Amino acid sequence: SVQWLTTGKGDMKSGSVTTLHDEDTVPEGFIEIPEYRVEFGCGDRCNPSFEEVSESKPAIYRLQWFRDHGLNPAHCKRLKVSGDSMIPILFDGDSVLCDCSSKEIISGKIYAFCFGGSQRIKRLFTKLNGGLIVHSENPNEQDEEIAPDEMDQFILIGRVVDRSGSGPF
């Protein structure tokens, strides 16, 4: 408990930790968010579609967490991180929760997107000329720029609103 951690008094293990087993149902006030793979069907304009990853276990979130963050869980998808370009924030194998209803870029936030045929998760900065700076957190990676006349190749999947995984903080 917080009291035990701060004062050494009280019950060490009091709290609201809930352990679920595979056969358990999700408790009231919680929701499962499965992991998805993003697929792109290209015509005149590529639009992402989401395929649920059946071999992955869903993450369980409190519904209150979504309310506290102003998010609708129906618009959120979990995606798997691949690569080391976002270390030390995101690590290979981590999962991120993306708000796929978010279609306006807030400069300095992390987004999942497709550009030039590749799917990425990066920090985006808006430019006054209408382009973007694509920033990797890994200091070994250089920033990229997307020029205003290249924005027709840019497809926003969603804003990253949470991460989970085994990478250190």
Predicted ranges, named:
Residues W4-D92, F154, V161-F169:
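Short, positionally conserved secondary-structure boundary motifs
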